[in-house]
C-alpha cells in the first residue's frame, strides 16, 4: 500500500502552497529586505507569504526560479521558517543573505563575508541530541560558488567564522564577546 502524501500547506507561519517556493530560497532576516530583493532583482515577483509580516516572494532571476523570504531574528525564528520550507515546500537550499554585527575590529560596514562556519551560544540545536557542540558549516560547493561569483564580479570578500546569539543586547556579560574572537 502506498503511503498517501499529506499536503501540510499552508502552515501556521506561511500562507504559501506547495509549489509556490523555488528550490533555492534567499533568506534575509528582515522581511522588508526580502521585499526589496524581490522588487529590485526578480522578474515578475509574486508574494507567496505575508503571515505575521514575514514576506516571501518567488520570481525569476536570470532565467532561474528563485524565492526570497525573511527569517526574522534569532535561531528560533529562522528555525521555524527554514524547517517548514525544507519539510513542506520543497526548498532544497537556503542561502542566508543580509546584515550582521561584528566583533572583529578589522571588519567594516558593508564588508562581504563568505561564512565558513557558524557557532552559537544558543541551546536551540540541543533538541537534535548531537554529541558536543555543533558548529554549522555551509555546503562546500555553495560556499565556493559564492566566492567565485563575488570574485568574478570584483566584489572583495573575507572568509569568516560567525557567532549567532539568542540575545541582541548582552548586559550580563558585556565583555564576553572577546573570548569568541581569540
Region annotations inferred by a language model:
Residues 83-86:
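Glycine/small-residue-rich loop that forms an oxyanion/phosphate-binding "nest" at active or ligand-binding sites
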Residues 1-79:
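N-terminal short beta-loop-beta anion/metal-coordinating cradle
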Residues 105-109, 125-126, 172-175:
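Short acidic, glycine/serine/threonine-rich loops at helix termini
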Residues 91-92:
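Short acidic/polar active-site loop segments enriched in Thr and Asp
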Residues 117-134:
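Acidic/polar active-site rim loop that often engages polyanionic ligands
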Residues 137-182:
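Active-site rim beta-loop-alpha module in soluble metabolic enzymes
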Residues 108, 112-116:
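Structural signature of FAD isoalloxazine-binding scaffolds in flavoprotein oxidoreductases
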Amino acid at each position: 500500500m502506498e503511503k498517501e502524501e499529506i499536503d501540510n500547506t499552508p502552515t501556521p507561519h506561511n500562507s504559501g502552497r506547495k509549489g509556490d517556493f523555488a528550490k533555492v530560497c534567499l533568506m534575509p532576516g528582515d522581511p522588508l529586505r526580502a521585499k526589496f530583493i524581490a522588487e529590485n532583482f526578480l522578474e515578475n515577483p509574486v508574494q507567496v507569504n505575508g503571515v505575521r509580516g514575514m514576506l516571501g516572494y518567488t520570481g525569476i532571476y536570470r532565467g532561474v526560479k528563485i524565492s526570497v523570504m525573511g527569517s526574522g531574528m534569532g535561531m528560533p525564528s529562522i528555525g521555524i521558517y527554514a524547517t517548514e520550507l525544507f519539510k513542506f515546500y520543497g526548498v532544497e537550499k537556503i542561502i542566508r543573505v543580509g546584515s550582521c554585527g561584528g566583533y572583529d575590529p578589522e571588519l567594516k560596514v558593508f564588508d562581504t563575508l563568505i561564512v565558513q562556519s557558524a557557532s552559537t551560544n544558543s541551546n536551540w540545536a540541543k533538541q537534535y541530541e548531537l554529541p558536543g557542540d555543533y558548529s554549522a558549516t555551509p555546503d562546500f560547493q555553495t560556499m565556493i560558488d559564492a566566492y567565485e561569483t563575488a570574485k568574478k564580479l570584483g566584489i572583495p570578500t573575507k572568509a569568516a567564522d560567525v557567532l549567532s546569539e539568542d540575545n541582541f543586547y548582552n548586559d550580563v556579560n558585556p565583555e564576553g564577546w572577546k573570548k569568541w574572537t581569540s
